[in-house]
């Protein structure tokens, strides 16, 4: 196990966060320790951000980042990625990878081509990638914003949920709080497949977390009944 020497700042948790952490499914010390970049950690500190990260609980998993309310989120999270050493892939429409230069650039950044003709196809492709990574005992994490947009919508898109359930991997909850200027990657849970119970847990963990534009934060619930559910994943 290689421990990080990036100088990640682990701050004291509030009383509410201590209660929430007591209900998570994975606890430090985590199995996967990463090597971050000290310069990126220094930049975050100089910008006033406090970062808490103690590793990942498994070699495969899904990270969701909430709330996504501003284009600035990308900049902050990019420095977070460099500071922690987290290498995470992201989903992109498969046709984009057929464009010569763009496709190569997307793969360099960690893009994974998925079919978006149906949500079942996208989730099925993602689950298959996780299954292959498990067979190969290969590191593979996917990161995404569950809303899929920085604008307020009635709920979260179901792709992350059905992928995590279908692949049976840990779900990491990244809390991006502009009010406190904190980034916490300390909560990892197992989804049960019971949407009501799982989203109640998600609401508890993200309670009080404020985005850059709080009015744009989408409620923590799945979008309407027209969105395919977790049990459609085979």
Annotate the PLM regions.
Residues 15, 71, 98, 213-216:
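Detector for Asparagine
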Residues 7-49:
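Extreme N-terminal tail/first-helix region
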Residues 9-13, 34, 46, 56, ...:
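Extended interaction regions within the primary functional domain
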Residues 26-29, 45, 49-208, 221-226:
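Soluble catalytic domains of membrane acyltransferases
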């Amino acid at each position: 196990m290689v421990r990080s020497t990036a100088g990640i700042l682990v701050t004291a948790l509030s009383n509410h966060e201590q209660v929430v952490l007591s209900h998570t499914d994975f606890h430090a010390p985590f199995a996967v320790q990463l090597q971050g970049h000290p310069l990126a950690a220094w930049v975050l500190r100089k910008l006033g951000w406090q970062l808490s990260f103690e590793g990942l609980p498994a070699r495969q998993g899904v990270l969701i980042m909430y709330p996504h309310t501003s284009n600035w989120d990308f900049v902050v999270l990019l420095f977070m990625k460099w500071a922690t050493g987290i290498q995470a892939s992201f989903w992109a429409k498969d046709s984009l990878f057929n464009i010569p230069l763009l496709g190569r650039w997307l793969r360099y950044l960690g893009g994974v081509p998925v079919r978006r003709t149906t949500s079942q196809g996208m989730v099925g492709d993602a689950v298959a990638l996780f299954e292959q990574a498990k067979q190969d005992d290969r590191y593979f994490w996917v990161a995404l914003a569950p809303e899929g947009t920085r604008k307020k919508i009635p709920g979260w898109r179901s792709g992350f949920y059905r992928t995590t359930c279908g692949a049976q991997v840990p779900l990491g909850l990244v809390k991006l709080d502009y009010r406190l200027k904190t980034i916490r990657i300390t909560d990892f849970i197992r989804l049960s497949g019971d949407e009501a119970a799982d989203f109640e847990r998600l609401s508890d963990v993200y309670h009080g977390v404020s985005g850059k534009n709080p009015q744009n934060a989408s409620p923590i619930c799945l979008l309407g009944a027209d969105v395919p559910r977790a049990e459609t994943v085979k």
